[in-house]
């Protein structure tokens, strides 16, 4: 077996990849999610004139192995294939203590055929983190955006845990980007008004956070 759908493959010779709990530094079992870390002779030595960033990047385990933190969330299956799911920064802890992965919510939203793009972020509300979804619908779907949101919300309720169901949805024309061309997630998180949430019978309630 040389490949699997969704996997980035095997580490190359001389490179060791493993998955750890980012809080406890416990090495995860096959199939368990965690932060992907790498040990390689080609790994960088340090951040230039930035001791704190260097300390934050490296983790040395009880065997003296120095792992580099990739900042990516993923898992290794029993056949040794590595799967990268998303960024660790796309994760937050809900009111009940559940670890919520924004990319899981996005995957559920993407299953709707009317979606052109989406971005799910965790925002602070009433002292804890909640997920909200920013959505761009495909051209031609503008006349029934409310129905699209209602359908997505119902699907998320069926597929996701209660804490992972978006608390609000916002239809967008585009997403803000940085000068680098990357999506400006922090700016998206600052957008806290004019969301809607389905409350039944085809009714959408306007909500702000």
What is each model feature region?
Residues 14, 53, 114-117, 174:
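Glycine-centered tight turns that cap/initiate beta-strands
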Residues 18-37, 75-79, 142-149, 180, ...:
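Conserved beta-loop-beta connector loops within the AMP-binding
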Residues 21-23, 50, 54:
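Acidic/polar helix N-cap motif
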